A protein has these predicted regions:
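Serine-hydrolase catalytic core
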Residues: 73-138
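Active-site gating loop/helix substructures
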Residues: 52-102, 143, 147-149, 155-182
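Alpha-helical interaction elements in eukaryotic regulators
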Residues: 12-16, 96-99, 202
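Non-transmembrane, juxtamembrane loop and terminal tail segments
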Residues: 252-258
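Intrinsically disordered, low-complexity regulatory regions of eukaryotic regulatory proteins
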Residues: 81, 250-251
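Serine-dependent carboxylesterase/thioesterase catalytic core
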Residues: 1-91, 134
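C-terminal catalytic-base region of ester-bond hydrolases, centering on the histidine
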Residues: 113-247, 258
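Short amphipathic alpha-helical surface micro-motifs
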Residues: 12-16, 105-109, 166-171
């Protein structure tokens, strides 16, 4: 590892690896590759079928609690839940989010270390999926986000701000503009839904940006195995824990397993 290593982040693993680069980066990451990551967060939880009112009602209830102390310390998805739909929710994100708000350097006091470490990357590769439905907005994979309520001109909440027109890029909060000027940012699209890695998608990345010598098929299958721990499974576990804690009857402070 003295010469560094290439890092691949699947789904939420993408922003967590970026957090490693920004905060530590020892040993150093050479090329950072993210598949379907939520670099600018998500504005709604995935999982409900279209028209499923009960499911949507439950999810909306959980979304309203994403910035509670319990959620911020126990739920993985809460670390990158960035709700820009309502001014009150966005203010909660700014005040209480413990991860994404920090690694995106969105606060008034910028961490120069984050920018310095990102600039050490040789390549930062971001892959999105053409039929993405899990990540909302899907452009979050490329650092695009819905405009925050403070800067919206009207009530339209579904217009995304591209990376290169965002303040994060223009003011170079985490070094992306520097990487772009150097030709070190790469944006790719793979056909399919969230985390459907087709052979062409694998070849695009694993035969171009990762590893020396090239990855063989066995290595790619091992990497794909990690992907099978899906975002849905993690969210389901988190929601079950959250439901027990948030909806526990008053006065029932005992922790037990039945």
């Amino acid at each position: 590892l003295q010469a560094g290593f290439d890092a691949i982040g699947f789904s939420q693993g993408g922003q967590f690896l970026r957090g490693y680069v920004e905060r530590f980066n020892t040993p150093r990451v050479r090329n950072l590759v993210t598949f379907g990551a939520q670099h600018m967060g998500i504005t709604q939880l995935p999982g409900c079928a279209e028209g499923d009112r009960l499911c949507n009602l439950v999810l909306r209830s959980f979304e309203g609690r994403m910035y509670s102390d319990f959620a911020q310390t126990h739920l993985v998805v809460a670390q990158y839940f960035r709700d820009t739909r309502l001014a009150s929710q966005y203010q909660q994100y700014e005040q209480r989010n413990r991860f994404l708000y920090d690694i995106n350097n969105e606060g008034p006091s910028k961490q120069e270390l984050y920018k310095t470490n990102i600039k050490q990357l040789e390549k930062f590769v971001m892959v999105r999926f053409s039929e993405e439905e899990t990540v909302v907005p899907s452009e979050s994979t490329w650092f695009s986000a819905y405009e925050d309520p403070e800067h919206r001109r009207d009530d339209v909440v579904n217009m995304t701000i591209p990376l290169r027109t965002s303040r994060l890029y223009k003011e170079d909060w985490i070094g992306l503009r520097h990487l772009d000027a150097r030709g070190s940012l790469a944006f790719h699209t793979c056909e399919g839904q969230h985390m459907q890695l087709s052979p062409p998608c694998k070849s695009l990345v694993f035969h171009t940006y990762v590893g020396h010598p090239r990855f063989d098929e066995a290595s790619m299958n091992i990497l794909e195995g990690f992907m099978n721990i899906s975002l849905y499974a993690l969210i389901c576990i988190g929601l079950m824990i959250c439901m027990r804690r948030l909806y526990r009857p008053p006065g029932d402070d005992a922790t037990h397993v039945t």
